[in-house]
């Protein structure tokens, strides 16, 4: 192996980006098939293949960072910029949903009965399950910060406890959201209210599942001694993402659940 006289990571050719793109196409096509033809075969194939790509891509990144030492301070700086830009792009993604919601609700058209919520829509009570979900996500924000401080202080046992608690709260939120969807008196097909509500809260729910998965990988790595007090960017990125999910939920709760009802 040739001597490397710089601190940059020269990445080896990887099949995962193109395979990841193919599984994303399969999953989104499967979603369309499910919505229009009530068939989940393609969606299941897409999700399973995406899971396989995720596991193998994560394995490669873990090997490059933990075992080969490619994630030097210079590389970590680049990864931090990348994560910040990714979260910024996600913020603009949600901005589009909020824009659609306020565009429709601030000046309701005659088709909606000139009112918001539209005629015939019975909105969810913001002081019931949505308020509990808000408390759960805020509590998970506290526990993930507790885990972060425990890692930086070298207290591995406490970090494992805090991170496990965060993941359990994340899955509890997802279960409550699924229950709320099941019991809602309106659907995604019920006017622009149903469309904006389910698309915005559904995409947020998807982000909670992604964040919970990200934190689960971090927990497994923490158990296997992959993180040190000064080298744990994988966890840091997951924590940033989780705080972003928390903040988006607060905006969703205040606008769609509380003000929108």
UniProtKB/Swiss-Prot annotation:
The keyword Zinc-finger does not apply. It is a multi-pass membrane protein. It catalyses: 4 Fe(II)-[cytochrome c] + O2 + 8 H(+)(in) = 4 Fe(III)-[cytochrome c] + 2 H2O + 4 H(+)(out). Keywords: Membrane, Mitochondrion, Mitochondrion inner membrane, Translocase, Transmembrane, Transmembrane helix. It is found in: Mitochondrion inner membrane. It comes from the Eukaryota. One of its GO terms (cellular component) is mitochondrial inner membrane. Residues 35-40, 106-128, 184-190, 257-261 are mitochondrial intermembrane. GO terms for biological process: mitochondrial electron transport, cytochrome c to oxygen; respiratory chain complex IV assembly. The keyword S-adenosyl-L-methionine does not apply. The chain crosses the membrane at residues 16-34, 41-66, 73-105, 129-152, 156-183, 191-223, 233-256. Its main location: mitochondrion. Belongs to the cytochrome c oxidase subunit 3 family. Component of the cytochrome c oxidase, the last enzyme in the mitochondrial electron transport chain which drives oxidative phosphorylation. The respiratory chain contains 3 multisubunit complexes succinate dehydrogenase (complex II, CII), ubiquinol-cytochrome c oxidoreductase (cytochrome b-c1 complex, complex III, CIII) and cytochrome c oxidase (complex IV, CIV), that cooperate to transfer electrons derived from NADH and succinate to molecular oxygen, creating an electrochemical gradient over the inner membrane that drives transmembrane transport and the ATP synthase. PANTHER family: CYTOCHROME C OXIDASE SUBUNIT 3, CYTOCHROME C OXIDASE SUBUNIT III. Component of the cytochrome c oxidase (complex IV, CIV), a multisubunit enzyme composed of 14 subunits. The complex is composed of a catalytic core of 3 subunits MT-CO1, MT-CO2 and MT-CO3, encoded in the mitochondrial DNA, and 11 supernumerary subunits COX4I, COX5A, COX5B, COX6A, COX6B, COX6C, COX7A, COX7B, COX7C, COX8 and NDUFA4, which are encoded in the nuclear genome. This is Cytochrome c oxidase subunit 3. It comes from Coturnix japonica.
